[in-house]
C-alpha cells in the first residue's frame, strides 16, 4: 500500500469513528451538526478542493462537482428542515472515498505488474579499467566496448559473451521462470539478470537502441493508445454529466412550479431531495473508472505473462481475431536446419556424418553448419583437400584420400551414380564415396514442439482459419501444414509475395473479423504493419519486430499466441460486463429516484456500490494464469 493510500485509509477510519459517534452518542443538536461537519471535511475536503479547481479551470461537470453539489445540497436541506442528522450527506462522501481507495489499489496492482517489467531498466554498466571495475551510465558505453556483468546484476546493454558462463533469468521479459544457460559466443539481451557466474560482454548496440530501452518505451506509450470503448466512455461522460445536472435542476424546479400553478403545495424540500438523490445516482464514475482500469489491468496481466500489448486499441482488435496467418520460419518451426534423418548403405551413421561434415567444412551454407553440429566434434581440415563446388548441384572433396561427392540427385546423375530416392520432407543430401553410393542425409527445419498444440489452441479460442506462408517448396510446405493441422498454406513465396497474400486474405474476410499476422520479426515489418494486428514472436533482441508489431511475444513459444487472444477476450468481456451492469443499475435507480421511491442510501449503492463492484470485476483482468 502506498503512502497516499495509507493516508486515505486513516481518513476513512477516522471518518467512520466520528460518524458513528455523531449518529449514536446523545449530544446537543448544535454539537451534533458541528461533529457531522468535521466528519464531512475530514473525508471530503479534497473532493471540494477538486470541484472548486475544476470550476476555476472551466471543467465544471465532473464526478467531484456532482458529489460536492449533492452532499452540500443535502446538508443545506437538512439544516433548512432543522434536522441535525447529516448521516446521508457524510455517507455519500465516505463510501465514495472507499470506492476511490479500491480503484487506487486496483490500479496499483496493475501498475506493479508493469513496474516489474519496468524494473528491467539497468542503473549502471561495469567497465574494467586497470584491473578495477568502474560503474558508468549505460548511455555512455560505446558499441564494441566490453562490459562486465556480475551475479545478481542486470545485463545493461545487448551484446555477445566473450568470456564466462552463467545462468540468466529472463522472466521479466518472457514470463518464463526457467533460467537460460549462456556460454561464450552467445548473444545476450539487456534486461536479463545474471544468476551465476561473471560474464564479459562485447556490446553490439548503444543503450538507447538496446532491447530494454525499446520495451520500456513501448510500455510507457501503451496507456496513450485508447480503445474505441474508452474513447466512447470519455465522450459519453462529457455529454452525460451536464445532461444529468440539467435533469436534476429540472427535477428540483419544474414539479414544484407546476404544483404552485395547479394550486397545490410546492413541496420544494421533497423535490430537491429527489434531485440530489438523482445527482448521486447519476455520477458516471463506475464507467469512467472501471473501463480504463479493465484495459490497464489486462495490459498489466499480459505483460506478466511475457505478452506486450501496445495499447487498449490493439487489445480490442486482438479480441476480434478470426484469422491467424503465420510466417512459417521462426514461428511454427525453429528456423534452424538440423539433421532429421540418415539413411546409409554400408557405412555407419556416425561415419557418414563425419565424412559429410568434413567435405562441407569450407562452406558457409546453413546446411554445412547443420552437418558440423550433428557431427559434434572439431573439424580437422588437414584431412580435407581438393574441394570443388558445383553450382546448383553440391560439391566434391577428398577426405582421408577418399573422393567424396555430396549434393542433390542432379549431382549423382552427373557423376553417373545410382541413388536411392528419399520420400522424407526436407533437403536431401546424397553421398557417394569413390564413385559408389553411400547413402543420404535429410536436413530440415524442425517443427517447434508446441506448434501443433498451438494451432489446436487457436481453434479452441474461436479462430476460424489458420494460414501458413512460406518460401519453401510446395511439397515441404504441404507436409508441415498437414503435420501441424494448418487450414491453408501458400508456398514458394518471396517476401513481397507475402504482403500480397495477406492483402488477398484481408479482402476476402468479413469486415468484423480481424486478421492477425505472426512473424519472428526478421523481414516481417511490411506484413506486420499491413495486417489488422501484427504479432512479433520471439522478439527479444529484434528492434524491427518491436517497432512494427502491435503485440510483442517476448519468447518463441507459439502457445503464447492463443494466450494473448484469450487475455484480450477476457478483458473485453469484463469491459462489457461493467458497461451493462453500471448502465442497467443506474437507469433503474434513476427512475426510482425521480419517482421518489429511492432514498440517498440506494443512491449511494447505485454510485459507490456499483463502482466498487465494477472495480473488483476489472481487477479480474489481472489474472491471466489459466487463460
Predicted feature residues:
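Transmembrane helix-loop-helix hairpins at the membrane interface
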Residues: 2-124, 235, 242, 342
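Soluble-to-membrane junctions at the N-terminal ends of transmembrane alpha-helices
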Residues: 1-14, 34-37, 48-75, 216-250, ...
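Conserved catalytic phosphorylation-site environment of P-type ATPases
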Residues: 56-57, 63-71, 173, 273, ...
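Membrane-water interface of transmembrane alpha-helices in multipass transporters/channels
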Residues: 29-37, 60-68, 81-92, 232, ...
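Conserved ATP-binding TGD loop and adjacent catalytic N/P-domain core of P-type ATPases
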Residues: 401, 427, 433-577
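Conserved cytosolic catalytic loops of P-type ATPases
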Residues: 116-209, 313-356, 398-399
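Juxtamembrane coupling segments of multi-pass membrane pumps/enzymes
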Residues: 65-66, 91-151, 172, 182, ...
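Cytosolic catalytic regions of ATP/NTP-dependent phosphoryl-transfer enzymes
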Residues: 122, 126-130, 146-150, 323-417, ...
Amino acid at each position: 500500500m502506498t503512502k497516499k493510500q495509507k493516508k486515505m485509509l486513516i481518513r476513512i477510519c477516522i471518518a467512520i469513528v466520528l460518524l458513528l459517534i455523531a449518529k449514536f452518542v446523545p449530544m446537543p443538536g448544535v454539537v451534533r451538526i458541528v461533529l457531522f461537519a468535521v466528519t464531512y471535511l475530514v473525508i471530503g475536503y479534497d473532493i471540494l478542493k477538486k470541484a472548486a479547481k475544476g470550476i476555476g479551470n472551466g471543467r465544471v461537470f465532473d464526478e467531484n462537482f456532482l458529489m460536492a453539489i449533492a452532499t452540500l445540497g443535502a446538508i443545506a436541506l437538512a439544516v433548512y428542515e432543522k434536522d441535525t442528522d447529516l448521516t446521508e450527506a457524510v455517507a455519500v462522501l465516505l463510501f465514495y472515498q472507499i470506492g476511490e481507495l479500491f480503484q487506487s489499489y486496483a490500479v496499483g496492482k496493475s501498475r506493479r505488474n508493469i513496474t516489474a517489467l519496468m524494473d528491467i531498466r539497468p542503473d549502471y554498466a561495469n567497465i574494467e579499467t586497470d584491473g578495477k571495475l568502474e560503474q558508468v551510465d549505460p548511455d555512455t558505453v560505446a558499441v564494441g566496448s566490453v562490459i562486465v556483468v556480475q551475479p545478481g546484476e542486470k545485463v545493461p546493454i545487448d551484446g555477445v559473451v566473450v568470456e564466462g558462463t552463467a545462468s540468466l533469468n529472463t522472466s521479466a521479459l518472457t514470463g518464463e521462470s526457467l533460467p537460460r544457460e549462456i556460454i561464450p559466443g552467445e548473444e545476450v539481451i539487456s534486461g536479463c539478470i545474471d544468476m551465476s557466474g561473471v560474464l564479459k560482454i562485447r556490446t553490439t548496440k548503444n543503450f538507447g537502441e538496446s532491447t530494454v530501452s525499446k520495451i520500456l518505451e513501448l510500455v510507457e506509450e501503451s496507456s496513450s493508445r485508447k480503445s474505441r470503448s474508452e474513447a466512447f466512455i470519455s465522450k459519453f461522460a462529457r455529454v452525460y454529466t451536464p445532461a444529468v445536472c440539467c435533469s436534476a435542476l429540472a427535477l428540483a424546479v419544474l414539479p414544484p412550479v407546476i404544483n404552485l400553478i395547479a394550486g397545490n403545495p410546492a413541496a420544494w424540500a421533497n423535490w430537491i431531495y429527489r434531485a440530489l438523490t438523482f445527482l448521486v445516482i447519476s455520477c458516471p464514475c463506475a464507467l469512467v473508472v472501471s473501463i480504463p482500469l479493465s484495459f490497464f489491468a489486462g495490459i498489466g496481466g499480459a505483460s506478466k505473462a511475457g505478452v506486450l500489448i501496445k495499447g487498449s486499441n490493439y487489445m480490442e482488435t486482438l479480441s476480434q481475431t478470426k484469422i491467424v496467418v503465420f510466417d512459417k520460419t521462426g514461428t511454427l518451426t525453429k528456423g534452424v536446419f538440423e539433421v532429421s534423418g540418415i539413411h546409409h548403405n554400408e557405412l555407419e551413421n556416425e561415419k557418414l556424418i563425419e565424412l559429410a561434415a568434413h567435405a562441407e567444412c569450407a562452406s558457409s551454407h546453413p546446411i554445412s553448419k547443420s552437418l558440423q553440429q550433428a557431427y559434434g566434434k572439431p573439424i580437422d581440415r588437414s584431412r580435407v583437400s581438393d574441394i570443388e563446388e558445383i553450382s546448383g548441384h553440391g560439391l566434391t572433396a577428398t577426405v582421408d584420400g577418399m573422393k567424396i561427392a555430396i549434393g542433390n540427385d542432379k549431382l549423382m546423375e552427373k557423376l553417373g551414380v545410382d541413388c536411392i530416392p528419399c520420400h522424407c520432407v526436407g533437403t536431401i543430401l546424397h553421398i557417394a564415396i569413390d564413385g559408389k553410393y553411400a547413402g543420404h542425409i535429410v536436413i530440415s527445419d524442425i517443427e517447434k514442439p508446441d506448434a501443433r498444440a498451438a494451432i489446436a489452441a487457436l481453434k479452441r479460442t474461436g479462430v476460424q482459419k489458420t494460414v501458413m506462408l512460406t518460401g519453401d517448396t510446395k511439397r515441404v510446405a504441404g507436409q508441415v501444414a498437414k503435420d501441424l493441422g494448418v487450414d491453408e498454406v501458400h508456398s514458394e513465396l518471396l517476401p513481397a509475395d507475402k504482403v500480397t497474400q495477406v492483402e488477398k486474405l484481408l479482402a476476402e474476410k468479413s469486415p468484423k473479423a480481424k486478421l492477425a499476422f505472426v512473424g519472428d520479426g526478421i523481414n516481417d515489418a511490411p506484413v506486420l504493419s499491413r495486417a489488422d494486428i501484427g504479432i512479433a514472436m520471439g522478439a527479444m533482441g529484434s528492434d524491427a519486430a518491436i517497432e512494427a508489431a502491435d503485440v510483442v511475444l517476448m519468447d518463441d513459444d507459439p502457445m503464447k499466441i492463443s494466450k494473448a487472444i484469450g487475455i484480450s477476450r477476457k478483458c473485453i468481456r469484463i469491459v462489457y460486463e461493467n458497461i451493462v451492469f453500471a448502465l442497467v443499475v443506474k437507469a433503474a435507480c434513476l427512475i426510482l429516484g425521480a419517482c421518489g421511491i429511492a432514498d440517498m442510501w440506494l443512491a449511494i449503492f447505485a454510485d459507490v456500490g456499483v463502482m466498487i463492484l465494477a472495480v473488483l470485476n476489472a481487477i479480474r483482468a489481472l489474472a491471466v494464469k489459466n487463460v
